[in-house]
Amino acid sequence: KSKVSVYLESGDIPHLLLFGRAGTGKTTLAKLLVNNIDCDYLYINASDENSVDVVREKVKNFASTLGFKDMKVIILDECDYITPNAQAALRNLMETFSKNCRFILTCNYVERIIDPIQSRCQSFQIVPPDRKQVAQHLANILTNENVQYDVKDIATIVNGGYPDIRRVINGAQRQVVNSQLTIDENTIVQNDYKLEVLEILKTQD
């Protein structure tokens, strides 16, 4: 959090590599940064656009054209899907446009990113919060959306989706009917996790 605050206060960022499990908020953090500093930005989902030609063309066109802001930022989401050849091309582009363009790379598997790119970035592992925190977050979302729920159902959903926070939230959305969170009674919940979640939710008042 302290690093993010420094970046937001300074209005400047280095090249960043955000890595960690799916659903832990890497893309959300990247977009938070670009939306709160004075920059033009380009978002590329590298799992869909991962070839040498696409990476080179999109990145080069954006980085080399005149923008409205002094700084440009390129978010390459899921960049562990980029082919090794495309990563080599990306490394060269990062060097060529380093004066006016920053890169934020996100990935699940940092070992798939070539060393020359890793060495040019400040790397941060995004670690998921614990189950209790996820349960509290989900409870807050449901409360804000005026959705009625039973704490046992919160436990079920968290246990089924953790540590993927996105999966937890999406799972809850699918179970909401008429502003009520309803879980199939046949869903199995491990008692130890249920008790932990119930404990934190009972003390939220």
Which functions belong to the PLM regions below?
Residues 1, 51, 130, 182-184, ...:
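General structural signal for secondary-structure boundaries
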Residues 1-124, 132-133, 139, 143, ...:
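P-loop/Walker A NTP-binding region and its immediately flanking N-terminal helices
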Residues 127:
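A Lys-centered signature of the CheY-like receiver
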Residues 140-205:
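AAA+ P-loop NTPase domains with strong preference for DNA replication initiators
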